[in-house]
């Protein structure tokens, strides 16, 4: 049976990770190591200036006072590490599409698994709310079972977004590319009860492209979106242009 390390960024008590654990334990041996609080937006951050403390909960999950990346690193490259065949992160309670992946702790946990040489999956709900986690859990469990029977040998992270609906209403699956969002709305300015100036992030931007092969379009049309993400962030198609430009500056 495949051995899975399961983490997330919404925290070890979040309903998404509980639902995903229930689905995955039917097809794999699952170990949960997750943050002790919500770490949404943590991206690939590490805890470098404080010790990491791990607590085993009554349900067998491990709670960590660190980031999603810390949790996966603990589970794969520390004295508490065990054999792992696959890293899975989620279920995030909202989409991780387009530019979201740069900020997402959900995607970052999967990226850390890939960085440690393991296949990895990040899974998020295509809508905001706490319903239909069972839909996403079933989708991922089916993919994991297929991966065990027929290994997918790609040097990538699979970023999966699942429509916010019941399983029977899913229209299918599309392999997609990342879309783009408009810039976020202006930060909100306020003052705390003591009169000190404070700021809050404004709402995220809406999607900026209606291309047919993006993650946004797939979710909008009722399809599961699977986007392969690479650790190599080199903009390869621009290297010749940059080389020519540098030559002209001599």
Swiss-Prot record:
GO cellular component: cytoplasm
InterPro entries in the cross-refs: SurE, SurE-like_Pase/nucleotidase, SurE-like_sf
Cofactor note: Binds 1 divalent metal cation per subunit.
Record GO terms (molecular function): 3'-nucleotidase activity; 5'-nucleotidase activity; exopolyphosphatase activity; metal ion binding; nucleotide binding
E.C. no: 3.1.3.5
Subcellular location(s) per record: Cytoplasm
Reactions this protein catalyses: a ribonucleoside 5'-phosphate + H2O = a ribonucleoside + phosphate
Sites where the protein binds a divalent metal cation: 9-10, 40, 92
Keywords assigned by UniProt, alphabetized: Cytoplasm, Hydrolase, Metal-binding, Nucleotide-binding
Pfam family of the protein (one): SurE
Domain of life: Bacteria
Transmembrane segments: none
Signal peptide (UniProt feature, chain positions): none
Cofactor or coenzyme needed: a divalent metal cation
Function: Nucleotidase that shows phosphatase activity on nucleoside 5'-monophosphates.
PANTHER family from the UniProt entry: 5'-NUCLEOTIDASE SURE, 5'_3'-NUCLEOTIDASE SURE
HAMAP family reported in the protein's UniProt record: SurE (MF_00060)
Similarity comment: Belongs to the SurE nucleotidase family.
Protein name, as recorded: 5'-nucleotidase SurE
Species annotation: Idiomarina loihiensis (strain ATCC BAA-735 / DSM 15497 / L2-TR)
């Amino acid at each position: 049976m495949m051995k899975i390390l399961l983490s997330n960024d919404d925290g070890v008590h979040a309903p998404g990770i509980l639902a995903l654990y229930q689905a995955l334990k039917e097809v794999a041996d699952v170990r949960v190591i997750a943050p002790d609080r919500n770490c949404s937006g943590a991206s690939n951050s590490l805890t470098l200036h404080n010790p990491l403390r791990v607590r085993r909960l009554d349900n067998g999950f491990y709670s960590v006072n660190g980031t999603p990346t810390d949790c996966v690193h603990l589970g794969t490259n520390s004295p508490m590490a065990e054999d792992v065949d696959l890293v899975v992160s989620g279920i995030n309670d909202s989409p991780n599409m387009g530019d979201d992946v740069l900020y997402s702790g959900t995607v970052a946990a999967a990226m850390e698994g890939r960085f440690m040489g393991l296949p990895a999956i990040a899974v998020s709900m295509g809508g905001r709310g706490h319903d239909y986690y069972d839909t996403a859990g079933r989708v991922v469990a089916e993919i994991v079972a297929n991966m065990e029977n027929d290994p997918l040998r790609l040097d990538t992270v699979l970023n999966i977004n699942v429509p916010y609906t019941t399983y029977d209403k899913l229209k299918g699956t599309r392999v997609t590319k990342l879309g783009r969002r408009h810039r976020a709305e202006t930060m909100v300015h306020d003052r705390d009860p003591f009169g000190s100036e404070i700021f809050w992030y404004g709402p995220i931007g809406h999607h900026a492209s209606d291309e047919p092969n993006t993650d946004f379009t797939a979710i909008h049309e009722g399809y599961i979106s699977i986007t392969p993400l690479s650790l190599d962030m080199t903009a390869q198609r621009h290297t010749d242009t940059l080389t020519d430009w540098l030559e002209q500056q001599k």
